[in-house]
Curated annotation (Swiss-Prot):
InterPro entries xrefs: Asn/Gln-tRNA_amidoTrfase_suB/E, Asn/Gln-tRNA_Trfase_suB/E_cat, Asn/Gln_amidotransferase, Asn/Gln_tRNA_amidoTrase-B-like, GatB, GatB_Yqey_C_2, Gln-tRNA_amidoTrfase_suB_CS, Gln_synth/guanido_kin_cat_dom
Keyword terms, alphabetized: ATP-binding, Ligase, Nucleotide-binding, Protein biosynthesis
Protein name in the entry: Aspartyl/glutamyl-tRNA(Asn/Gln) amidotransferase subunit B
Subunit-level organization: Heterotrimer of A, B and C subunits.
GO MF entries: asparaginyl-tRNA synthase (glutamine-hydrolyzing) activity; ATP binding; glutaminyl-tRNA synthase (glutamine-hydrolyzing) activity
SMART domains: GatB_Yqey
UniProt catalytic activity: L-glutamyl-tRNA(Gln) + L-glutamine + ATP + H2O = L-glutaminyl-tRNA(Gln) + L-glutamate + ADP + phosphate + H(+); L-aspartyl-tRNA(Asn) + L-glutamine + ATP + H2O = L-asparaginyl-tRNA(Asn) + L-glutamate + ADP + phosphate + 2 H(+)
UniProt similarity note: Belongs to the GatB/GatE family. GatB subfamily.
GO aspect biological process, one term: translation
E.C. no: 6.3.5.-
């Protein structure tokens, strides 16, 4: 319906990729057995006190900077959010209610008319995660490995106007989290959880409609489905002259619908108070400036740099949206220093190769990536051709041998001796006098013909650059 518009704000919880939890030295891992990564602080045993993980604060400041925010670094304090539930051993959650670490930022996206649009971000704040609940046969099982895992909650203003804009916002946020090494941002592991606040109003109206919150959506595609369903649900109520109730709902991905959870009239009073077991942290401007200088690039700086080095936009966005692939790309490009070539051989050819074997880039060792880098250097130096490079890439993957060894084993060693190549040209030209006479009229065609003859004669082992340069000298005499 063109007469109504949707108003969307979102809240995103992202789990930080720190080595230990937020207030204890317990390691963090998504892959460990249930209830094996816990200690007395995580379980809130009597007499325990929290100690702030420095890395969590640093990552909060990095994200605030990446989102163009004002940081409250001169007074970093924590608060208690009280509620009683199985997943919260203390009976309260340590969060930041009164002094969030970052305020008043934005993410820029491209709207549906292809115009730049800034989506304001109200605040980001640090908090600890709760235990993970699993319900089986009417019984609830708790895994406290997740309890105390550090989170950042990102709260946007209600600036989004469609499911498409919301998806673009989340994709850009995810790239920022990956680029700044703040989170692995894997929704399948629960590292990125999204709540959507949605209302509709007559187009042109200033006041908001009644807001409905959709909790814990587990994929970006489901965010779009939830918004579109909820828009139509609310619109149908309005067209039937029924009121939209303020509710909390969840998205059911088996039916692609939102399902009632509770009325907002039943909203919990969290009774926020200061967390006095954690002293405020005072960071100077100089400290924060020095910290932020360790990440001099913004994500847009990197986009421009890669564009200037020949990568197309679609390739850049693929890299920025895949943290492990981008990490491998950076590592190999340090060896090669040619982003376009690295993208072709690593991100297209090699990824296609490992996908056939149901592997992912995280499975690949740095040693193997180093050998791929050395292979790409040889290709860029025209010491091997494209067909040979593809064969060598497969052999590196299967045997873990270095490219120079494989070149010898496969008989791909090139003829680079100029005297030998000159003698070969004399032989080829002597056998093709008629074509030689056509050079002045059709130089490109003649050069192409002779290069083909050289490759045939040497079984593609003559170095093409050296061969072509010698041919030009002979033909221009």
């Amino acid at each position: 319906m063109q007469n109504f518009e949707v108003i969307i704000g979102i809240e995103v919880h992202t789990a930080l990729n720190t080595k230990t939890k937020m207030f204890s030295n317990t390691p963090t891992s998504h892959k460990s057995m249930a209830n094996t990564l816990i200690n007395e602080i995580d379980l809130a045993l009597p007499g325990t006190l929290p100690s702030v993980n420095q890395e969590v604060v640093h990552k909060g400041l990095f994200l605030a900077n990446a989102l163009h925010m004002h940081t409250n670094h001169q007074f970093i304090a924590f608060d208690r959010k009280h509620y009683y539930y199985l997943d919260l051993p203390k009976g309260y959650q340590i969060t930041q209610n009164y002094f969030p670490i970052g305020q008043n930022g934005y993410i820029q996206i491209t709207d549906e008319n292809n115009n730049p649009k800034k989506i304001r971000i109200k605040q980001i704040h640090l908090e600890e995660d709760t235990a993970k609940q699993t319900s089986v046969n009417n019984q609830v099982y708790l895994d406290y490995n997740r309890a105390g895992w550090p989170l950042i909650e990102i709260v946007s203003e209600a600036d989004l106007r469609s499911a498409q804009e919301t998806v673009l916002f989340l994709e850009e946020l995810r790239k920022i989290l990956l680029f700044n090494d703040i989170s692995d941002a894997k929704m399948e592991d629960g590292s990125l959880r999204v709540d959507v606040n949605i209302s509709i109003r007559p187009r042109g109206a200033k006041s908001f409609g009644t807001k409905v919150e959709i909790k814990n959506i587990n994929s970006i595609s489901n965010v779009a489905k939830a918004i579109n369903y909820e828009y139509n649900r609310q619109l149908n109520l309005i067209l039937l002259n029924q009121s939209v109730e303020q509710q909390t709902r969840r998205f059911d991905d088996s039916t692609n619908t939102t399902v009632f959870m509770r009325s907002k009239n039943d909203a919990i009073n969290y009774r926020y108070i200061r967390e006095l077991n954690i002293a405020p942290i005072y960071l100077s401007d100089e400290y924060v400036s020095q910290l932020l200088s360790t990440k001099p690039y913004s994500i847009n700086d990197l986009r421009q740099e890669l564009l200037q080095k020949g990568l197309v936009s679609s390739a850049i966005e693929q890299l920025l949206g895949d943290g492990p692939l981008f990490k491998a790309f950076k590592y190999v490009n340090k060896i090669v220093n040619n982003p376009s070539s690295v993208y072709k051989w690593l991100c297209l050819e090699f990824i296609g190769l490992i996908n056939k074997n149901t592997q992912i880039i995280e499975d690949i060792s740095m040693e193997l990536l180093q050998k791929i880098g050395a292979m790409i250097v040889l290709f860029d130096q025209t010491l091997i051709n494209g067909k040979q490079t593809k064969t060598i890439l497969e052999k590196i993957y299967l045997t873990n041998k270095d490219p120079q060894t494989l070149i010898k084993e496969l008989g791909f060693e090139q003829i680079t001796d100029e005297n030998e190549i000159t003698n070969l040209w004399n032989q080829i030209l002597a056998n093709n006098q008629e074509m030689l006479l056509q050079y002045e009229e059709r130089p490109d065609r003649v050069e192409k013909f002779f290069m083909g003859e050289m490759m045939k004669l040497t079984k593609a082992q003559a170095n093409p650059t050296i061969s072509f340069n010698i041919l030009k000298k002979i033909l221009q005499k």
